[in-house]
């Protein structure tokens, strides 16, 4: 039998349709400099949650729950109760009792294996590292070289596609034959077709796969290289935003399929490698989850019910009584869960302050290009495409040109030095000649005496130069600026009763030596600080011409009202406010009160966070605690500068009066919404199709990174090595590209800080309004009806229980 002899005939249209379906199931991962939280299961939302959970268990050995011990511990500590287990059992229609359910939990965390591939059968026949590791490593190195556009000084030939580059690299790599103990490997590589589509066809035909096996087989192949598959999906996502497409994911699938053909020993007798694989493959395909797996899924649902019960108890208490004194200021935060404790503390420190929640990009569909650079970055959710351009300006175009040229020269000098550092001849002589000069800085950074270089968009600026600049929109007609401002204010439910001061707070994080730092910044700003958006909107709303136009739209901002912008540092809970012009005497007094309240609120939140960060000894000493946090965020060795969005579990869109004073433990996204000001339901539609979806992405990234960090997370942060300058990270020196969150972002070394619960969305709106949005949008319908999140309704009567939308319609929540 020759190498290219067809083993089985198959319909090519069916084959390529199955390949397309497999590729469409892969969700994108964003690069490090735009690292946003993404659900790795986003493209599977057209299936039910339970169905996807079972598929992942069968195909990849992945689960969407914690292990049994975690749920036993939750019961022992009182976070979970028998009544929650019973509610979960009743909901599933199970005849088990809570005692039987607990008895069925696995005694130990068994290693699930998923569907076997041919490489697994061949693994035992070669020495370490083994075929699966060797294949993943080889594909990873090839993809890293192919996609690199920023780090390597040498890159492979890109005149053709990824598959062709991989095939050419394989032909040149003689070490593979040695590592695999397969002398004929190079000959087999030469027999591979030149085109990826043909390689897929040949692999399927030679391995004897039937049409009804292709969906599972292709899915298994891509799940083995999920990191690079997700990067290819990102390239496809970006191309489609521009009306184009990208086929690198199909080519990666062809590479994976070709490897299966390469490890085939070409024998077909009983006991051969192929025969053993076919037997194991068919047996695994017919396997159903054991009772222990079902018990884990029920425990996870019980924990969600326990959380919803706790949430309902807080929301059903008497509503907060508004302060009798006039409103001093209104402070708008991003809906990020880290803003909830600061909002609560701020309102407690100064009851005359009211807080609001809105997506941190503040409704501005912008892309930002820092002055003096060509590095444009999106400042809006990954779901959307930018429509407006923003840069920095001093207000004087001539001065802007001078500043831009000055910065470009500084950046060019720095780039030339970095190029010299990378030269092969510099590897030893550079250290010998200049190493001692770095000693002071090295010791200073190690001891926390020196801070890092700061935010990238401030690089190569002197402090005075940076202070002279502020974000500025590219020329835009006044009518367009008015319409933009009006849309944002209506979405914020901010169209009347304006206080003297309005403060728009973006947020950003601070850490050192952290490739995934953007993952701690504002997800609504595509992994960037929200400073640009906040300052831009404040400037827009303070513009006299825009205010006049808003008045014609029925939104009258009083002359005495001033809009300010600021930045919430989520790592230290310090708040910086940007004041570009002098305030009037009346506003200055209000500002001083607000500033004092912000400082007091920050101190209180730091005190509350101290224990989780291991700083309990200085929790009651505000200055020492702040100093410790500042040192912590500048510490090169700190793997947990902050906990990010760990613990997120809920999303509430309601008037602030419904949540004011409720301790939501920093676990809830809070979005201001008043359905009485939303006559046509457009604001609710926007909330359910944008912020709610973004919150779901965040929630699922944290959930999957916790339940299966090996596949959906990025492993040990200490071992991270950056790939391609900004693409992502390897754990160690190779393997698959790692996606998701590092274990240190979810686990404190003793226990999980994040509990994997699907998002509970609470909307304060009539049923009919909610149902209209669900009916109009397939994405929302998939999330709600397939169980990817839980949808609940908050009644205007605070004493009424929450209503949950389930298969039988809206039903009152127990508890």
UniProtKB/Swiss-Prot annotation:
Q: Which UniProt keywords apply?
A: Cell inner membrane, Cell membrane, Membrane, Metal-binding, Transport, Zinc
Q: What organism does the UniProt record list as the source?
A: Ectopseudomonas mendocina (strain ymp)
Superkingdom field = Bacteria
| Positions of Zn(2+) binding | 334, 336, 507, 522
The membrane topology of this protein is: Peripheral membrane protein
Q: Which cofactor does it need?
A: Zn(2+)
Specify the protein name. Answer: Probable inorganic carbon transporter subunit DabA
Can you tell me which family this protein belongs to? Answer: Belongs to the inorganic carbon transporter (TC 9.A.2) DabA family.
């Amino acid at each position: 039998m020759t190498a290219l002899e067809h083993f089985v005939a198959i319909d090519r249209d069916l084959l390529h349709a199955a390949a397309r379906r497999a590729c469409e199931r892969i969700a994108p991962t964003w690069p490090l400099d735009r690292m946003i939280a993404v659900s790795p299961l986003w493209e599977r939302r057209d299936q039910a949650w339970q169905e996807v959970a079972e598929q992942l268990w069968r195909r990849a050995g992945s689960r969407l729950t914690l292990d049994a011990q975690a749920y036993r511990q939750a019961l022992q500590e009182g976070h979970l109760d028998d009544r929650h287990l019973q509610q979960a059992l009743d909901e599933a229609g199970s005849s088990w009792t809570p005692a039987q359910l607990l008895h069925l939990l696995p005694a130990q965390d068994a290693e699930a294996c998923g569907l076997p591939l041919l490489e697994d059968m061949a693994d035992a026949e070669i020495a370490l590292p083994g075929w699966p590791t060797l294949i993943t490593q080889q594909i990873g190195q090839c993809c890293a070289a192919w996609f690199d556009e920023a780090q390597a000084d040498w890159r492979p030939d890109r005149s053709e596609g990824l598959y062709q580059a991989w095939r050419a690299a394989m032909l040149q790599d003689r070490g593979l034959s040695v590592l695999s103990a397969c002398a004929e490997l190079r000959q087999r590589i030469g027999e591979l077709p030149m085109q990826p589509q043909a390689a897929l066809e040949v692999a399927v035909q030679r391995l004897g796969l039937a049409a009804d096996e292709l969906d599972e087989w292709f899915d298994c192949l891509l799940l083995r290289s999920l990191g690079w598959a997700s990067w290819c999906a990102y390239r496809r996502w970006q191309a489609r935003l521009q009306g184009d497409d990208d086929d690198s994911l199909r080519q990666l699938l062809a590479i994976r399929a070709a490897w299966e053909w390469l490890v085939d020993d070409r024998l077909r007798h009983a006991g051969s490698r192929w025969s053993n694989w076919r037997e194991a493959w068919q047996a695994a395909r017919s396997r159903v989850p054991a009772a222990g797996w079902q018990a884990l899924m029920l425990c996870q649902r019980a924990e969600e019910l326990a959380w919803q019960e706790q949430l309902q108890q807080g929301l059903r208490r008497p509503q907060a009584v508004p302060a009798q004194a006039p409103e001093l200021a209104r402070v708008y935060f991003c809906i990020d869960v880290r803003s909830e404790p600061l909002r609560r503390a701020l309102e407690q420190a100064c009851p005359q302050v009211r807080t609001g929640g809105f997506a941190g990009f503040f409704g501005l569909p912008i892309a930002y290009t820092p002055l003096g650079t060509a590095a444009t970055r999106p400042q809006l959710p990954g779901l959307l495409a930018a429509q407006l351009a923003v840069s920095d300006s001093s207000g004087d175009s001539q001065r802007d040109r001078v500043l831009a040229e000055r910065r470009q020269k500084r950046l060019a000098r720095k780039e030339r030095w970095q190029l010299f550092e990378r030269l092969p001849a510099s590897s030893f002589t550079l250290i010998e000649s200049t190493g001692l000069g770095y000693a002071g800085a090295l010791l200073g950074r190690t001891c926390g005496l020196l801070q890092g270089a700061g935010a990238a968009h401030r690089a190569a600026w002197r402090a005075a130069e940076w202070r002279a600049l502020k974000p500025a929109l590219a020329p835009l007609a006044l009518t367009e600026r008015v319409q933009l401002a009006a849309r944002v204010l209506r979405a914020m439910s901010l169209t009347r009763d304006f206080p003297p001061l309005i403060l728009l707070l973006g947020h950003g994080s601070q850490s050192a030596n952290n490739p995934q730092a953007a993952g701690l910044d504002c997800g609504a700003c595509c992994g960037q600080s929200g400073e640009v958006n906040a300052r831009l909107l404040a400037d827009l709303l303070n513009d006299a011409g825009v205010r006049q136009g808003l008045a014609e739209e029925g939104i009258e901002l009083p002359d005495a009202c001033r809009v300010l912008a600021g930045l919430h540092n989520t790592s230290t809970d310090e708040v910086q406010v940007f004041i570009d012009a002098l305030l009037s005497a009346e506003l200055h007094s209000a500002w001083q009160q607000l500033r004092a309240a912000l400082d007091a609120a920050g101190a209180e939140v730091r005190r509350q966070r101290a224990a989780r960060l291991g700083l309990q000894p200085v929790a009651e000493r505000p200055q020492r605690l702040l100093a410790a946090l500042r040192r912590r965020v500048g510490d090169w060795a700190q793997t947990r500068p902050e906990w990010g969005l760990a613990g997120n579990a809920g999303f509430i869109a309601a008037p602030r009066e419904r949540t004011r004073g409720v301790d939501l433990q920093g676990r809830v996204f809070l979005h201001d919404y008043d359905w009485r000001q939303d006559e046509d339901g457009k604001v609710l539609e926007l909330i359910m199709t944008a912020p709610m979806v973004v919150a779901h992405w965040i929630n699922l990234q944290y959930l999957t990174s916790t339940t299966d960090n090996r596949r959906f997370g990025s492993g040990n942060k200490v071992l991270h090595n950056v790939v391609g300058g900004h693409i992502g990270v390897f754990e160690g020196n190779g393997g698959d590209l790692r996606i998701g969150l590092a274990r240190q972002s979810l686990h404190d070394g003793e226990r999980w800080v994040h509990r994997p619960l699907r998002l509970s969305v609470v909307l304060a709106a009539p049923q009919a309004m909610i149902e209209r949005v669900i009916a109009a949008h397939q994405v929302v319908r998939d999330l709600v009806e397939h169980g990817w999140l839980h949808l609940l309704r908050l009644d205007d009567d605070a004493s009424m229980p929450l209503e949950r939308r389930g298969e039988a319609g809206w039903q009152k929540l127990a508890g």
